[in-house]
Protein backbone atom coordinates (compact mmCIF):
# COMPACT_ATOMS: atom_id res chain seq x y z
CA UNK A 1 0.00 0.00 0.00
CA UNK A 2 1.34 3.45 -0.87
CA UNK A 3 1.46 6.33 1.55
CA UNK A 4 -0.41 9.52 0.73
CA UNK A 5 1.98 12.29 -0.23
CA UNK A 6 2.08 15.19 2.19
CA UNK A 7 4.94 17.07 0.57
CA UNK A 8 4.91 20.81 0.96
CA UNK A 9 4.96 22.73 -2.30
CA UNK A 10 8.24 24.36 -3.26
CA UNK A 11 8.13 28.08 -2.57
CA UNK A 12 10.60 30.49 -4.22
CA UNK A 13 10.99 34.25 -4.07
CA UNK A 14 10.16 36.31 -7.14
CA UNK A 15 13.52 37.67 -8.38
CA UNK A 16 11.95 41.10 -8.98
CA UNK A 17 9.70 41.82 -5.98
CA UNK A 18 10.69 39.03 -3.57
CA UNK A 19 7.08 37.83 -3.05
CA UNK A 20 6.47 34.11 -2.49
CA UNK A 21 5.76 32.02 -5.60
CA UNK A 22 4.60 28.39 -5.56
CA UNK A 23 6.78 26.41 -7.98
CA UNK A 24 4.31 24.28 -9.93
CA UNK A 25 2.56 24.08 -13.29
CA UNK A 26 -0.18 26.41 -12.06
CA UNK A 27 2.36 29.27 -11.78
CA UNK A 28 2.82 30.23 -15.45
CA UNK A 29 5.38 32.98 -14.82
CA UNK A 30 7.62 31.07 -12.41
CA UNK A 31 10.05 32.03 -10.97
CA UNK A 32 8.25 35.38 -11.28
CA UNK A 33 4.97 36.13 -9.52
CA UNK A 34 3.43 37.92 -12.52
CA UNK A 35 3.91 38.94 -16.14
CA UNK A 36 4.77 42.45 -14.89
CA UNK A 37 7.72 41.19 -12.80
CA UNK A 38 8.83 38.98 -15.70
CA UNK A 39 8.87 41.98 -18.08
CA UNK A 40 10.71 44.19 -15.56
CA UNK A 41 13.44 41.54 -15.37
CA UNK A 42 13.56 41.20 -19.16
CA UNK A 43 13.94 44.98 -19.49
CA UNK A 44 16.85 44.99 -17.04
CA UNK A 45 18.65 42.35 -19.13
CA UNK A 46 17.86 44.20 -22.39
CA UNK A 47 19.21 47.48 -20.96
CA UNK A 48 22.31 45.57 -19.80
CA UNK A 49 21.62 46.48 -16.16
CA UNK A 50 22.10 42.75 -15.50
CA UNK A 51 24.79 40.59 -17.04
CA UNK A 52 26.65 37.35 -16.53
CA UNK A 53 30.19 38.12 -15.35
CA UNK A 54 33.01 37.24 -17.68
CA UNK A 55 35.38 38.56 -20.27
CA UNK A 56 33.75 40.07 -23.36
CA UNK A 57 33.95 37.91 -26.48
CA UNK A 58 34.80 40.74 -28.89
CA UNK A 59 35.33 44.46 -28.89
CA UNK A 60 35.47 47.07 -31.63
CA UNK A 61 39.26 46.98 -31.41
CA UNK A 62 39.32 43.33 -32.53
CA UNK A 63 39.00 44.25 -36.20
CA UNK A 64 35.22 44.09 -36.37
CA UNK A 65 34.77 47.85 -36.52
CA UNK A 66 32.60 49.26 -39.32
CA UNK A 67 35.26 51.95 -39.93
CA UNK A 68 37.42 49.27 -41.51
CA UNK A 69 35.11 48.73 -44.51
Curated annotation (Swiss-Prot):
Residues annotated to bind Zn(2+): 14, 17, 33, 37
GO molecular function: DNA topoisomerase type II (double strand cut, ATP-hydrolyzing) inhibitor activity; zinc ion binding
Ranges annotated as biased composition (Acidic residues): 59-69
Residue ranges, annotated region (Disordered): 46-69
Oxidoreductase listed as a keyword: no
Keywords: Metal-binding, Zinc
Cofactor: how bound: Binds 1 zinc ion.
Necessary cofactors: Zn(2+)
Database matches in InterPro entries: DNA_gyrase_inhibitor_YacG (IPR005584), Znf_NHR/GATA (IPR013088)
GO BP terms in the entry: regulation of DNA-templated transcription
Function in brief: Inhibits all the catalytic activities of DNA gyrase by preventing its interaction with DNA. Acts by binding directly to the C-terminal domain of GyrB, which probably disrupts DNA binding by the gyrase.
HAMAP family: DNA_gyrase_inhibitor_YacG (MF_00649)
Subunit structure as annotated in this protein's UniProt entry: Interacts with GyrB.
UniProt-listed NCBIfam families: PRK00418.1 (NF001638)
Stated family: Belongs to the DNA gyrase inhibitor YacG family.
UniProt-recorded name of the protein: DNA gyrase inhibitor YacG
Amino acid sequence: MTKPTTEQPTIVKCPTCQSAVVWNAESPFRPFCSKKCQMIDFGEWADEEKSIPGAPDMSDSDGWSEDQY
